[in-house]
């Protein structure tokens, strides 16, 4: 991923959670500090070796910031020691952006769930909210480091052929520059489930 990332394709993806109230940045920072204790494998920098890139543990600490740049902007800067993820906020939204070399969608989902859980507990514990665990009690750092692709993927495994359905393509004239265009939609879960069941 690192060798292929550039201004046009940063290999960064974003997950976010929209709350019902404005985000308190100080509490979010405290929640992030707690979350990183559970996910220490996220405290990595990408280094360039003689033949390949590698991840190296670091002492950098993530700092919560108000959203200040375009979504999915570059996180990996060649020859610069920076974390490969970022937590920002905007009004009621908590954003988690991560360079794909660090984790996949599942890891990002677990990190964001833990972050939001910690945030909500810190904000609402005065109202009697009890702490809950979202992760298995016996999960270790080694469990977090497992590369599921290597564990489960096999090029020899036969897969049944399926008819390929093409996703809807938004057709528009390309604009100049390296700007990411964000499309956001809101849909009823019931309506989407009903339609997906109709289509099989």
Each predicted region: which residue ranges?
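Non-catalytic N-terminal regions of enzymes
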Residues: 1-147, 189, 193-195
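Flexible, P/S/T/G-rich "lid" or insertion loops adjacent to the active sites of thioester-utilizing
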Residues: 149-199
